[in-house]
């Protein structure tokens, strides 16, 4: 009976160890994916901010050019 208990314990132990390793790898992959998503959203925010600023400056420039040409007529 003791042999059966030891064998069962060994089988359970050998099944649990790979599961814990797989869980750890899965968590690491999820963390890497989350970091990549954060980096991409940060880049998108930076690009959209630059485009908004450039659009605002261009709009101001065109507005001032329009007022100059309108004032000369």
UniProtKB/Swiss-Prot annotation:
Its main location: secreted. Residues 25-45 are annotated as: Disordered. It comes from the Eukaryota. Pfam families: FSAP_sig_propep (PF03032). Residues 23-42, 72-73 form a propeptide. Keywords: Amidation, Amphibian defense peptide, Cleavage on pair of basic residues, Cytolysis, Hemolysis, Membrane, Secreted, Signal, Target cell membrane, Target membrane. Residues 1-22 form the signal peptide. GO terms for biological process: defense response; killing of cells of another organism. GO terms for cellular component: extracellular region; membrane; other organism cell membrane. Expressed by the skin glands. InterPro entries: Frog_antimicrobial_propeptide, FSAP. It is found in: Secreted; Target cell membrane. The modification Glycine amide is found at residue 70. Residues 30-40 have a biased composition (Acidic residues). Peptide with no antimicrobial activity. May act in synergy with cationic peptides by enhancing their activity. Has a moderate hemolytic activity. Belongs to the frog skin active peptide (FSAP) family. Plasticin subfamily. Plasticins have huge conformational plasticity. They can display random coil, alpha-helical, beta-sheet or beta-harpin structures. This is Plasticin-A1. It comes from Agalychnis annae.
């Amino acid at each position: 009976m003791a042999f059966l208990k030891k064998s069962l314990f060994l089988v359970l132990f050998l099944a649990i160890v790979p599961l814990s390793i797989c869980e750890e790898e899965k968590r690491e992959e999820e963390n890497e994916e989350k970091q990549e998503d954060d980096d991409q959203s940060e880049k998108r925010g930076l690009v959209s901010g630059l485009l908004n600023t450039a659009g605002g400056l261009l709009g101001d420039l065109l507005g001032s050019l329009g007022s100059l040409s309108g004032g000369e007529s």
